[in-house]
Amino acid sequence: VRSSAASDVYKRQNYHTGTAASSRTTAGAVQYRNIENPWGNIWEWIDGVNFSDGTVYVCTTPANYADDTTSGYTNAGTKTQSDGWIKAIGISSTAPWAFFPTEVGGSETTYIPDCAGYGSGWRVLYVGGGYGNSTGNVGLFNFNANNTSSNSNSNVGARLLVFSLIGAGFSSPLGENIAA
């Protein structure tokens, strides 16, 4: 059973929007709704998303996550094959929670001021952007599908998952039933 008081606490929270630094080329992390550093420090690898040329494949079952395959994945549509400033984002009809750039041609001051980059063949998704990237290459909607699954770099990481338990029988975000 979730406590209704939790939503009251959430409503009173200070969202701490913004950044400590005025430039993306200097130190300082963004915090939004108590999500620490949603972009600008490292590229975040998004597992469960594979690209094969212009096609997007998504997987909702963590046990089936794999790279360079469509097995266990759903075709979520197509994306732009061009690099550039994002002009349009598409929503998948087969996975309505999935969105990805479908058109580039914007600028740093128009449409969505973040970039999309894509390579050909099998690719994986990084989002956000790393510290030290140019100011145009970091942002909440910055999509990078230029890298293969074998790529490794110190500016690529993943977000840890933290959740709290409230009451018996609460399910974790991955679906496991957890007894109190």
Model-assigned labels for residue ranges:
Residues 14-15, 22-25, 38-51, 69-180:
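C-terminal, surface-exposed recognition/capping segments
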Residues 7, 51, 65:
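Active-site microenvironments of metalloenzymes and redox enzymes
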Residues 1-6, 10:
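Single conserved hydrophobic/aromatic residue that forms the stacking wall/gate
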Residues 52-62:
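A short, polar/charged loop-to-alpha-helix boundary motif
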Residues 28-30:
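Short, small/polar residue-rich loop motifs at catalytic or cofactor-binding pockets
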